[in-house]
């Protein structure tokens, strides 16, 4: 059985015109059973003027004070930090921002094109994506390092057999 206690309902429920003139036990806007919908544009009824001086001007403030978030969602809202929209900025600002982004993308793409030109011709058979270009460059750099320093390439393959004497003197800890 339900062990929660509920407030007892009044003996008589009045739904007619006289209900507007009944004395209230507490202000109606503090009663959790009453849903208040305020419209700031409409004038306040004269019969409740003595009970309304504590009401805030904005219905959003009333909702925030009594119930928390005015629009509770059952899931978290993504990107809550992005409250600024494009329409808050002028068209000149947006054009400049877009131009800066185009320039940035152009520079990045030129960098990848230059990197592709330095790769061996084996990699140039097909168009490489940015990730494939970076992976090919890493492989090619390690291949070139193994040609320059054959001892270090053996050390990388077998790290346990490396001796302290094979380290670069600048990297050796004294």
UniProtKB/Swiss-Prot annotation:
Keyword Transcription regulation set for record: yes
Disordered: region residues: 153-174
Molecular function, one GO term: RNA polymerase II transcription regulatory region sequence-specific DNA binding
Tissue: Expressed in the salivary duct cells. Also expressed at lower levels in testis and epididymis. Expressed in the olfactory epithelium (OE), in a subset of apical microvillar cells.
bHLH domain residues: 92-144
One GO location term (cellular component): nucleus
Knockout consequences: Viable and fertile. Salivary glands develop, but the submandibular glands are consistently smaller and overall levels of cell proliferation lower. Expression of cation-chloride cotransporter Nkcc1 is dramatically reduced in salivary ducts. No obvious morphological changes in the olfactory epithelium (OE).
UniProt-listed SMART domains: HLH
One BP term from GO: negative regulation of transcription by RNA polymerase II
Ranges for region Basic motif: 92-105
Induction info: Following injury of the olfactory epithelium (OE) in 3-4 week olds, up-regulated in the multipotent horizontal basal cells (HBCs) at between 1 and 28 days later.
SUPFAM superfamilies the UniProt entry points to: HLH, helix-loop-helix DNA-binding domain
Alphabetized Gene3D superfamilies for the sequence: Helix-loop-helix DNA-binding domain
Location relative to the cell: Nucleus
Subunit organization: Efficient DNA binding requires dimerization with another bHLH protein.
PANTHER family linked: BASIC HELIX-LOOP-HELIX TRANSCRIPTION FACTOR, TWIST (PTHR23349), BHLH DOMAIN-CONTAINING PROTEIN (PTHR23349:SF108)
Biological function: Transcriptional repressor. Inhibits myogenesis. Plays a role in progenitor cells which differentiate into ductal and acinar, but not myoepithelial, cell lineages in the salivary glands. Involved in the functions of the microvillar cells and Bowman's glands and probably, in a non-cell-autonomous manner, in the development or regeneration of a complete olfactory epithelium (OE).
Name of the protein: Achaete-scute homolog 3
Encoding gene per record: Ascl3
């Amino acid at each position: 059985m339900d062990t929660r206690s509920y407030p007892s309902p009044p003996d008589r429920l009045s739904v007619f015109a006289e209900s507007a003139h009944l004395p209230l036990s507490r202000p109606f806007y503090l009663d959790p059973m009453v849903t208040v919908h305020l419209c700031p544009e409409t004038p306040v009824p004269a019969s409740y003027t003595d009970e309304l001086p504590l009401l805030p001007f904005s219905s959003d403030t009333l909702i925030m004070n009594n119930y928390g978030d005015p629009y509770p969602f059952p899931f978290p809202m993504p990107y809550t930090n992005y409250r600024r929209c494009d329409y808050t900025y002028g068209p000149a600002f947006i054009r400049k921002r877009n131009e800066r982004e185009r320039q940035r993308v152009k520079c990045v793409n030129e960098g990848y094109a230059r990197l592709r030109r330095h790769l061996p011709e084996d990699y140039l058979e097909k168009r490489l994506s940015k990730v494939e270009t970076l992976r090919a460059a890493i492989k090619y750099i390690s291949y070139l390092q193994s040609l320059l320093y054959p001892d270090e390439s053996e050390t990388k393959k077998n790290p346990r057999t490396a001796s302290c004497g094979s380290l670069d003197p600048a990297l050796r800890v004294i």
